[in-house]
Amino acid sequence: MDASVDRITNLHFEILAKAGGHEIHQKYEAIRKLNLTGDSSKSNISVSARSAILKWADAKQGYIASQLDDRDYGDLIAKAVIFVPMSVITGGKNPKDLIPYGVVAAVLIFVPETLTLLDEIVINLMHDKKPLSSILLTKILRDMKIDVCGSNFDSFYYCPISRYNRHIIKLAGALPQMPTSVRLSVNDLARVAISEVHNQLISDKQMFFKLPTGFSPKVHCLKVLCTTEMEIFQKWVRTFMSDRPNEFIYSDQFNILSRTTYFSSDDPFSFFTLWRGWSTYKEILSQDQASSFLEAIGSGKPLRSSIATFPSMFDEGAIYIRYEWITPKDSANSKKAGSSAPSAPKM
């Protein structure tokens, strides 16, 4: 599928600059104002900046090394702003794992998972190759009037794929010629969609930190159903909450229907959620492309289901989570069959 780079750029500018712009400016200001050496490191401005970075570090949105005053920094770039997809953190990495060599203080800025759709698209610079995703970030920061580098800090993008022989990609100051369109595969669209749902469940509900009663990661797989349509989701919620109110709990804030009873491997699902990123996809794709994507993840299709993992905090190791889509076509088929309510598919 060919998608317009201008549409993708404008969409991510809306998300990063307009929705999250205040936080981005705050994090850049803290990195700029943090002084590491001399009397200036003890000024009220620097101490306040250090306090802010420590708070972000507690929320897994930053990193600051201990005993900063005892270090010899020389000519090292010792501070950094790192843009990273949330899936990197929910996949088990800690902020410290993302820090470039020599950096002792950093803040993380989470980017939409849809930005990773551009990771495979290589932009050739004079002596380097960078993913289009990092170039797009540079352009957005420039439009936000933010310098990507300073005398003692740099900006980076953590690229999840290993195509560039490194994951930490330094944001370039100059902007190369941008392509007018990019080709996106349905498989990548499905992968990113699952990443978004996975992030929702982990960051919004924290549900994988406490295992359901009777669930063992060694032998069981959590099952999550997700849908692109609010109408389908609301119908399911009404049905299960009215028919079996003691088995489920619904979070209107996070759009998640959770099973509360003892875990059984025969249950068709453990959680049912609305994928909120569908509106983002509809901005990137044409109507025909969006329909093709829904067809590809429909009933009986190879992209119907996907397995993700979450690092368990217990001795059992990783938790395996199976995600499966419920599309408008599935709902229509249910109506044709004469069903008065949607039925959970067998998994």
Curated annotation (Swiss-Prot):
One of its GO terms (biological process) is symbiont-mediated suppression of host innate immune response. The keyword Endoplasmic reticulum does not apply. Keywords: Host-virus interaction, Inhibition of host innate immune response by virus, Suppressor of RNA silencing, Viral immunoevasion. It comes from Wound tumor virus. InterPro entries: Phytoreo_Pns (IPR008777). Suppressor of RNA-mediated gene silencing, also known as post-transcriptional gene silencing (PTGS), a mechanism of plant viral defense that limits the accumulation of viral RNAs. It comes from the Viruses. Transmembrane segments: none annotated. Belongs to the phytoreovirus non-structural protein 10 family. This is Suppressor of RNA-mediated gene silencing.
